[in-house]
Curated annotation (Swiss-Prot):
One of its GO terms (cellular component) is cytoplasm. Residues 1-81 form the GST N-terminal domain. The gene is gstA. One of its GO terms (biological process) is response to hydrogen peroxide. It comes from Escherichia coli (strain K12). This is Glutathione S-transferase GstA.
Amino acid sequence: MKLFYKPGACSLASHITLRESGKDFTLVSVDLMKKRLENGDDYFAVNPKGQVPALLLDDGTLLTEGVAIMQYLADSVPDRQLLAPVNSISRYKTIEWLNYIATELHKGFTPLFRPDTPEEYKPTVRAQLEKKLQYVNEALKDEHWICGQRFTIADAYLFTVLRWAYAVKLNLEGLEHIAAFMQRMAERPEVQDALSAEGLK
């Protein structure tokens, strides 16, 4: 299978999940500004949405949207326990976090990355994100991972988005549980491999 990605983008969560799954895959970098692949091909021909991630399965099926890709990968390797079984409350708590990260955190950063966002609007965006990160920090207070004592795909997504918080220099002072979580994630070999493959540190 092939993962279409942009270094450091939200596709990093799917990349980490792929490495945690133990599956064989190849990486294809996408220039999202030009919508071109490494070889110059039109990315819209692969994914009409023009966004990453996209996962091309061996049978030719294309999956898009990171949350869907991560759940598919987790369910394909149940022995890895990246997502709890159907009908377990643990599974739905993980999905709850995936949705929160996608809608409240991930999309919350978008105005900070868009060059056309008015400068006077950015302090409000930053303040909203910092308030939400306080909630995340509190959720990690007594837990090793965001859903408890076992690593899940929600951790891969949370790690990816939290990296942006550091990149745009949000005020993370006093959020020691987030800092500890980021350190635990950085120590995972699969995370290290994903970051290295994307040329990140």
